[in-house]
């Protein structure tokens, strides 16, 4: 009941923000010049192995990439995907360590919110329901993206 009310409130908030954005004057913003680092082919190969469910191969490829001084912008992603491989293999403690690595070593990385969500999923699958709820509720308080927020709420709905 509480989650439904929370989701309804969040959906209203999203609609309000979209309307504000649509009615805002179109101001041209100056682009910051970021040096876009090219994604190493090894990263794409490791991700492809994960997507084709070859988790052991994917872990090996990501670990090798992690040891080869990858671009800084990918280091959190590498740890995240290693964790996702471990989770798929039901190696929950190893997955938890990887997601915690993302949160502790790369607190400003682009995988922080996803890692909090996956950390909660890992605890849930491990059977530590109260810890999973604690992690997921804590993740909600940290302003995740709408997509991740939806996943968190759905996961909380499943385990509560």
State each model region's role:
Residues 68-74, 104-111, 140-150:
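Short solvent-exposed coil/turn linkers within tandem alpha-helical repeat scaffolds
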Residues 1-61, 68:
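Acidic, proline-/serine-/threonine-rich low-complexity intrinsically disordered segments
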């Amino acid at each position: 009941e509480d989650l439904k009310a929370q989701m309804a409130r969040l959906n209203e908030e999203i609609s309000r923000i979209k309307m504000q954005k649509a009615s805002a004057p179109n101001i041209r913003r100056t682009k910051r010049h970021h040096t876009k680092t090219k994604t190493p082919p090894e990263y794409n190969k490791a991700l492809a192995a994960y997507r084709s469910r070859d988790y052991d191969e994917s872990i090996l490829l990501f670990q090798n990439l992690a040891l080869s001084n990858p671009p800084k912008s990918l280091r959190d992603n590498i740890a995240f995907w290693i964790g996702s491989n471990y989770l798929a293999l039901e190696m929950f403690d190893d997955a938890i360590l990887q997601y915690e690595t993302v949160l502790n070593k790369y607190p400003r990385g682009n995988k922080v919110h996803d890692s909090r969500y996956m950390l909660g999923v890992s605890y849930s699958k491990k059977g530590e329901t109260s810890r999973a709820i604690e992690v997921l509720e804590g993740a909600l308080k940290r302003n995740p993206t709408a997509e991740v927020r939806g996943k968190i709420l759905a996961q909380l709905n499943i385990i509560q």
